[in-house]
């Protein structure tokens, strides 16, 4: 036994293999089979660390070479080995060739020893070759049928051994191949191949070998003269020798040919080449590019040292093989090609008549003169595609034609193209710096024709330089200029001449010298260029015939090419310009980050910038397809981009993703954003998904939770589809809102830090540090929204998927992933913060589900608001969904949490009943958890105090919290609980939740219009929709909602800033509020300020306003701008300062309170900048307004109903928002004003009011915006949207719809807060935490603005129900239901639930999506998110400033876009609507939100697809926007810049 072991150990591979072949097999075996036997039989001990197969393979090969080798490798097979003693039988056997044994062995030996065969006698060669040939032939004929590949491979290897040399001409001609037979065959094969590949060779202008590959091409080209001879061509040259050697038996035509598996390059080497008869050598040499052959002293051509050993020859050989394998050389194909050529000839006969080999030939000009003269002319001609040489090329177009037609586009064509391109590029780079630039420029800049022509130049040039390549050149040209096919041109000489003349001419940019020089050095490259050029000109695939070089060139050309002519792969450039909005609508992942990058309004640009990966391109292509149909989406996208900022493609993306939905959304959305929401809801859902994808992605990168985002996205997507587009809409809307907000946040957020759109991803990412924390947190705020949106979406969808049980999982794991992580990061921060504050899981649920359900509901609400009628069902779906969410109450608690918030009624109703049920469990659980989890209890006390202080608020907070948190936060139970907790913990948190979340929704809704406005819009939409009566209230609500939004956002910002963890909306709402009064306030305020800031960035103003920009960028101290606001906010500032002092958030809060913008700016330098920026814009109004609003809010939370629109808290929160709101709203309002004077006036009035009511600074902004939004919204959404939103939106949308719509959070909340907090508002406001919470959550608008406001905010939270009641009272629908809701909420979870149901019916969904998403997750995606989004928006606005013009138009809408990107796909439509509605402001606002939601869907879809979001970001050299390295690419330019160029 030991002996055996020892033996086994000592046994060599050769011995083991011999044993196997002797004892275990009577047939040849492959190394793998031998190894299997060795292993099975234990013939050899395998040592670890070695690769047995490689060892065995090496041994077999080395031992099958020499005469003393043990093994024999069957010639025709890939790797079949047998013992040498059995070689004869097997070699003869497989080949079924007699008398092959000796030759086989000889071949083998010959192969093994390269010299053997070389010197073999003629007979030997003949015999060898014959047998080889026979073997190969028979094999190729018989075996190819059965297993040609096998025989080919074996043959190729065997050929190497020599036998193949002869047999597989091109197969593996081993150097020592039998010189005569094998070589002759080789020669003939080459001739044949070359004949066929000649076109390719010239095209590639590479090497003789290539020529072989080219021969086919060339052959075709030459065969253009006589297409049939193509095959005949290489047969004929070979026939002489080949016949002697039975060469005829070699199959040069069919894919079954042994040559298919033969490496021609192995067959043709200098040894085998020189073994060929001299006439064959000369024939083959002419197939090589001129650079690869040398003229000897005797005038004969000689092979250059590298001719057969360069990439061109390799490519030619490979392409020839590929063409052979593709059946290009079969008789049928040749006939077809010939026919096509004939057709070409017929079509181009006039060209034949006037054909000249070179320009001016008939005028008596010499070629040189012609070239010199025509460099310029030809260039023009080339550009026009009317080159005479082109004509000659045309003839060869036979092959070219077929390539052009794509019928014969073979692998080789792309290869050729690639090669040609490579060559072209190489040459261009080196020799044709000018020409290359020109040609490339032309190719790139000029349409494909020009490109093709430009490239043709090089090809032509190269052609003239390649006398031998003459044929090839014409071939190249043929493909290049199929149009110029002429029988005469077919002639190689004319072709060459034509090429020479045309090419140099065609390379007009090349100086004559260059042209002259090029002949040699550039021949190859110019040839490639020509090929490339021809490609672009005729057809990108045309170059295929051109040759490997052309192919190479093609590859390069193709990139620019598609860009130029058609989006083959949807070239980023073309598509960007063409599809920008759609992409945005689609929310391509690409955009996600890139959105900001694109300053232009082209959202796709921005998004495109994001991803240049294949997947991105594909996604874009898809999106483009969808988007193409929706120019309105484009507008929406633009708006969304502006608002979505982050998603850039938010609106557009959403629309696109929706495809049909987008269409609906786009159409209806654009035309009737609100009605469209019918389609929009779905569309919004889808768009939202896309947008979310788009915007989500940025948050992911921001959150670094791309995966999570993806998961969420996928889940959302999954859920979306099954759940309903509405759900998706909801979710996505929310996601859109969140994403839009987030994107906007990210977009704008980064803008704030970076001031660049690209900042979105980068700043978001960058911001992940300190600024990142702020910005990123803003982005995370945005991610928050995003996360909440995204996460929420994901979470929500996850929730949907995971329903109840998944609350923790969904919230925790996936939402955690998407939601939690995202939440942790952005929303995740909210989540994390929340958990940090209260409970990670809870946070996650809150954030995630909150986001999700709310998103859904919000989406619905938004959709409803937007789609009003159509939205209603969605809302109902949302309701159902909400129920689903409720079912997911735990999971969906988050969702519900949002859901209720969006629709206080709904929140009350759904979250109350279910969410509330869940919330009771979750609320206590989550709330408790949150309370337990973090300083939430402390915060809770504050909040609670605020809540309690505002008994209504408290109650409402509870109710609101339940619904708000649950519904608003979409965390149904968790959120509601958290909401309550938040409200309790952060009185404002709850308020924020409803307000923040609801506001988020409103914010989201308004997000586009204004962060605040968005929220207010949501509210406003509901409220406005609810009743014109509440216009004042609407402003109040607006302010409140915006406040809530800003508060939420600011709080988000604050929270983002203050609490990175609780950055998400939920976090913001919950965590920030819950985090700690201070912390919360801080976070809240911070977030809110940030929200404000973001809001501002969202607003055109911020982009426009240097101050805003400064603030956004952080160059301007927040305080600088803060002071004025601070004065205003001073009344509530005391608390705010505390908050701000506590944290930037605190200041921010105070700032927000004191200085809406200040607060907004407080969040971070960026936010501060934003705020500062905004402050300058809105400082007066905002500050005054903020102070007033705050004071008002503080003073008369109830009174501020008008001021309430700027509910003290809200304004406080919104000071930033207000400034932002104001500025943004100003811009937005301007946009909106542009859209609707009422909007503007209302906005301004509201803003003034809001600003006056510092409470409603955000609302002020929001109110203005919301008012703007609300009025139009009022009209459209008011009724329809309001109907649904009255309930759903009634809370949020009413706020959105009417100033109060937002005040549901802002207004409603303000109303509630004002009503409830009126008594307690100042008090809770003082209660920083409560204020913070209200500020952040309810108070994102109200409370977040100031401590006092927070309470009002908190009040708002409950009051939102009450507010909904009051506001809703005021706002027809929202008032009653909301009030009832508020009261119910306050009094009962179920009443709110009923309200929620009510809202859920319509407003809720929209509300939720708008304010909730915007508010709660994003920043109130509108304001708060806008803060987050603001930088993004700023970015976008800045980046998209041109766009922003558009977007500014819908600056508000932009904000909405930003805030509601998470909204329904309608968002895209909405964005479009926004554009439309921007006309009527209110409608616009609602629309935008919806669009934003839509975008969110898109974003979501995109988010999932955008892989670049996690990548490092770099700055665009053109505009300074930031995007991913992949997106910006080697040009160092973002898509926008590329498009512009």
Swiss-Prot record:
- Region of interest called Interaction with nucleosomal DNA forming a DNA clamp with BAP1, as start-end residue ranges on this chain: 243-246
UniProt motif NEF motif: location? 310-315
Q: Where is it localised?
A: Nucleus
Task: Give an example GO molecular function.
Answer: zinc ion binding
Q: Low complexity bias: where?
A: 199-212, 844-854
Recorded hits in Pfam families, A to Z, give: ASXH, HARE-HTH, PHD_3
Question: Which portions of the sequence form the region Interaction with NCOA1?
Answer: 300-658
The Basic and acidic residues compositionally biased stretches are 517-527, 536-546, 906-920, 1005-1035, 1224-1233
**Extent of motif LXXLL motif:** 284-288
Q: Where is this motif: Nuclear localization signal?
A: 408-415
The record's function comment reads: Probable Polycomb group (PcG) protein involved in transcriptional regulation mediated by ligand-bound nuclear hormone receptors, such as retinoic acid receptors (RARs) and peroxisome proliferator-activated receptor gamma (PPARG). Acts as a coactivator of RARA and RXRA through association with NCOA1. Acts as a corepressor for PPARG and suppresses its adipocyte differentiation-inducing activity. Non-catalytic component of the PR-DUB complex, a complex that specifically mediates deubiquitination of histone H2A monoubiquitinated at 'Lys-119' (H2AK119ub1).
Give the UniProt family note: Belongs to the Asx family.
Relate the assembly described in the record. Answer: Core component of the polycomb repressive deubiquitinase (PR-DUB) complex, at least composed of BAP1, one of ASXL1, ASXL2 or (probably) ASXL3, and one of MBD5 or MBD6. Distinct combinations of ASXL and MBD proteins may preferentially bind specific histone modification marks. The PR-DUB core associates with a number of accessory proteins, including FOXK1, FOXK2, KDM1B, HCFC1 and OGT; KDM1B specifically associates with ASXL2 PR-DUB complexes. Interacts (via DEUBAD domain) with BAP1 (via ULD domain); the interaction is direct and forms a ubiquitin binding cleft.
Tell me the protein's name.
Polycomb group protein ASXL1
Organism (species)? Homo sapiens
Q: What is the lineage of its organism?
A: Eukaryota, Metazoa, Chordata, Craniata, Vertebrata
């Amino acid at each position: 036994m030991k002996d055996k072991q020892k033996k086994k150990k000592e046994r060599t591979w050769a011995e083991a293999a011999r044993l196997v072949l002797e004892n275990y097999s009577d047939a040849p075996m492959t190394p793998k089979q031998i190894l299997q036997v060795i292993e099975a039989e234990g013939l050899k001990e395998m040592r670890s660390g070695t690769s047995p197969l490689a060892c065995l393979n090496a041994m077999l090969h080395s031992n099958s070479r020499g005469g003393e080798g043990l093994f024999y490798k069957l010639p025709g097979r890939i790797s079949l080995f047998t013992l040498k003693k059995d070689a004869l039988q097997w070699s003869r056997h497989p080949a079924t060739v007699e008398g092959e044994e000796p030759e086989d062995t000889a071949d083998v030996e010959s192969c093994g020893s390269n010299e053997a065969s070389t010197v073999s006698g003629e007979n030997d060669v003949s015999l060898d070759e014959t047998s080889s040939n026979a073997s190969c032939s028979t094999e190729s004929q018989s075996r190819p049928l059965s297993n040609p590949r096998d025989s080919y491979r074996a043959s190729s290897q065997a050929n190497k051994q020599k036998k193949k040399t002869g047999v597989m001409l091109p197969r593996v001609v081993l150097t020592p191949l039998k010189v005569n037979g094998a070589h002759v065959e080789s020669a003939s094969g080459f001739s044949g191949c070359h004949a066929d590949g000649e076109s390719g060779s010239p095209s590639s202008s590479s090497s003789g070998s290539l020529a072989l590959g080219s021969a086919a091409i060339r052959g075709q080209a030459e065969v253009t003269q006589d297409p049939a001879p193509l095959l005949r061509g290489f047969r004929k040259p070979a026939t002489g020798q080949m016949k002697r050697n039975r060469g005829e038996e070699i199959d040069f035509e069919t894919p079954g040919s042994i040559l298919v598996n033969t490496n021609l390059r192995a067959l043709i080497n200098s040894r085998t080449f020189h073994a060929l008869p001299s006439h064959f050598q000369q024939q083959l040499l002419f197939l090589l590019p001129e650079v690869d052959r040398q003229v000897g002293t005797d005038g004969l051509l000689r092979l250059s040292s590298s001719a057969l050993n360069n990439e061109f020859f390799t490519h030619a050989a490979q392409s020839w093989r590929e063409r052979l394998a593709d059946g290009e050389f079969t008789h049928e194909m040749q006939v077809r090609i010939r026919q096509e050529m004939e057709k070409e000839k017929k079509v181009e006969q006039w060209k034949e008549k006037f054909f000249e080999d070179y320009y001016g030939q008939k005028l008596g000009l010499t070629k040189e003169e012609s070239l010199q003269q025509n460099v310029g002319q030809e260039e023009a001609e080339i550009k026009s595609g009317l080159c005479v040489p082109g004509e000659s090329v045309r003839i060869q177009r036979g092959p070219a034609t077929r390539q052009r037609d794509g019928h014969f586009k073979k692998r080789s064509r792309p290869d050729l193209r690639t090669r040609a391109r490579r060559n072209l590029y190489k040459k261009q780079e080196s020799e044709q710096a000018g020409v290359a630039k020109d040609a490339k420029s032309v190719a790139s800049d000029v349409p494909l024709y020009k490109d093709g022509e430009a490239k043709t130049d090089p090809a032509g040039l190269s052609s003239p330089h390649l006398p031998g390549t003459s044929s090839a050149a014409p071939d190249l040209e043929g493909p290049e200029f199929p149009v110029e096919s002429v029988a005469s041109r077919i002639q190689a000489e004319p072709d060459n001449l034509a090429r020479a003349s045309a090419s140099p001419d065609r390379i007009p940019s090349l100086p004559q010298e260059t042209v002259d020089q090029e002949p040699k050095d550039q021949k190859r490259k110019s040839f490639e260029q020509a090929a490339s050029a021809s490609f672009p000109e005729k057809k990108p695939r045309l170059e295929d015939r051109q040759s490997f070089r052309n192919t190479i060139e093609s590859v390069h050309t193709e990139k620019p090419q598609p860009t130029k002519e058609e989006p083959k792969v949807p070239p980023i450039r073309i598509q960007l310009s063409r599809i920008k909005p759609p992409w945005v609508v689609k929310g391509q992942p690409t955009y996600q980050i890139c959105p900001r990058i694109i300053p232009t309004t082209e959202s796709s640009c921005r998004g495109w910038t994001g991803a240049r990966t294949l997947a991105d391109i594909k996604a874009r292509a898809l999106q483009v397809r969808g988007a193409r149909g929706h120019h309105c989406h484009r507008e929406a996208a633009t708006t969304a981009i502006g608002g979505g900022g982050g998603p850039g493609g938010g609106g557009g993306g959403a629309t696109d993703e929706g495809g049909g939905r987008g269409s609906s959304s786009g159409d209806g959305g654009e035309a009737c954003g609100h009605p469209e929401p019918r389609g929009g809801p779905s569309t919004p859902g889808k768009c939202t998904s896309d947008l979310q994808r788009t915007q989500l992605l940025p948050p992911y990168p921001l959150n670094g939770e791309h995966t999570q985002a993806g998961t969420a996205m996928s889940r959302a997507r999954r859920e979306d589809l099954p759940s309903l587009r509405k759900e998706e809409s909801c979710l996505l809307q929310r996601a859109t809102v969140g994403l839009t907000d987030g994107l906007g946040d990210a977009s704008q957020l980064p803008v704030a830090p970076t001031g660049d759109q690209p900042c979105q991803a980068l700043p978001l990412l960058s911001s992940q540090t300190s600024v990142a924390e702020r910005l990123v947190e803003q982005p995370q705020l945005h991610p928050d929204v995003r996360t909440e949106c995204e996460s929420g979406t994901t979470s929500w969808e996850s929730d949907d998927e995971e329903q109840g049980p998944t609350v923790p999982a969904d919230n925790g794991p996936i939402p955690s992933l998407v939601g939690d992580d995202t939440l942790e990061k952005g929303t995740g921060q909210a989540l994390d913060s929340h958990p940090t504050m209260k409970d990670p899981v809870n946070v996650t649920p809150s954030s995630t589900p909150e986001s999700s359900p709310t998103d859904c509901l919000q989406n619905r609400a938004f959709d409803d608001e937007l789609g009003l009628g159509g939205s209603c069902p969605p809302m109902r779906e949302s309701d159902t969904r909400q129920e689903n969410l409720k079912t997911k109450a735990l999971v969906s608690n988050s969702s519900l949490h949002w859901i209720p918030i969006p629709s206080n009624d709904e929140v009350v109703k759904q979250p109350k009943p279910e969410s509330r049920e869940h919330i009771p469990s979750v609320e206590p659980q989550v709330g408790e958890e949150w309370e337990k989890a973090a300083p939430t209890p402390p915060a809770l006390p504050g909040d609670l105090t605020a809540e309690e202080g505002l008994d209504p608020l408290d109650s409402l907070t509870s109710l609101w919290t339940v619904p708000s948190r649950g519904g608003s936060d979409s965390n149904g139970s968790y959120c509601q609980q958290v909401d309550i907790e938040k409200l309790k913990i952060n009185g404002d948190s709850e308020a924020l939740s409803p307000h923040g979340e609801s506001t988020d929704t409103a914010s989201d809704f308004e997000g586009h219009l204004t962060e605040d406005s968005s929220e207010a819009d949501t509210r406003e939409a509901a409220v406005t929709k609810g009743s014109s009566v509440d216009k004042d209230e609407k402003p109040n609500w607006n302010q409140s909602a915006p406040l809530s939004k800003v508060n939420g956002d600011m709080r988000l910002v604050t929270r983002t800033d203050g609490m990175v963890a609780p950055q998400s909306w939920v976090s913001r709402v919950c965590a920030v509020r819950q985090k700690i009064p201070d912390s919360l306030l801080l976070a809240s305020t911070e977030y809110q300020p940030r929200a404000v800031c973001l809001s501002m960035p969202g607003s055109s103003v911020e982009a426009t306003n240097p101050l805003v920009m400064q603030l956004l960028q952080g160059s301007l101290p927040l305080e600088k701008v803060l002071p004025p606001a601070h004065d205003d906010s001073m009344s509530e500032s005391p608390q705010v300062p505390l908050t701000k002092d506590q944290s930037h958030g605190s200041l921010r809060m105070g700032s927000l309170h004191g200085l809406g913008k200040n607060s907004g700016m407080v969040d971070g330098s960026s936010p501060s900048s934003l705020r500062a920026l905004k402050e300058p814009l809105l400082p007066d109004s905002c500050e005054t307004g903020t102070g007033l609003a705050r004071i008002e809010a503080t003073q008369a939370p109830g009174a501020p109903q008008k001021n309430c629109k700027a509910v003290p808290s809200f304004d406080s929160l919104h000071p930033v928002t207000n400034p932002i709101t104001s500025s943004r709203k100003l811009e937005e309002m301007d946009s909106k004003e542009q859209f609707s004077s009422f909007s503007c006036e209302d906005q301004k009035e509201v803003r003034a009011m809001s600003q006056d009511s510092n409470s409603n600074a955000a609302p002020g902004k929001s109110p203005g915006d919301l008012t703007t939004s609300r009025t139009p919204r009022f009209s459209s959404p008011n009724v329809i949207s309001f109907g649904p939103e009255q309930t759903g939106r009634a809370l949020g949308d009413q706020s959105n719809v009417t100033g109060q719509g937002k005040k549901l959070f802002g207004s409603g909340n303000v109303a509630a807060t004002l009503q409830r907090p009126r008594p307690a508002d100042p008090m809770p406001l003082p209660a920083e935490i409560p204020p913070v919470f209200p500020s952040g959550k309810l108070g994102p608008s109200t409370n977040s603005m100031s401590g006092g406001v927070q309470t009002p905010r908190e009040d708002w939270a409950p009051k939102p129900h009450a507010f909904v009641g009051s506001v809703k009272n005021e706002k027809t629908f929202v008032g009653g239901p909301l009030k009832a809701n508020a009261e119910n909420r306050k009094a009962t979870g179920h009443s709110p639930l009923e309200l929620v149901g009510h809202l859920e019916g319509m407003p809720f969904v929209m509300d939720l999506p708008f304010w909730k998403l915007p508010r709660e997750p994003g920043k109130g995606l509108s304001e708060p998110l806008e803060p987050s989004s603001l930088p993004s928006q700023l970015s976008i606005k800045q980046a998209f400033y041109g766009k922003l013009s558009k977007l500014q138009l819908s600056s508000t809408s932009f904000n909405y876009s930003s805030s509601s990107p998470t909204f329904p796909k309608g968002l895209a439509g909405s964005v479009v609507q926004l554009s439309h509605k921007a006309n009527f402001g209110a409608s616009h606002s609602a629309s935008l939100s919806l669009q934003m939601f839509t975008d969110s869907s898109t974003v979501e879809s995109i988010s999932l697809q955008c892989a670049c979001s996690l990548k490092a970001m770099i700055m665009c050299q053109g505009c300074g926007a930031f995007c991913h390295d992949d997106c910006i690419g080697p040009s160092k330019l973002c898509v926008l810049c590329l498009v512009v160029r």
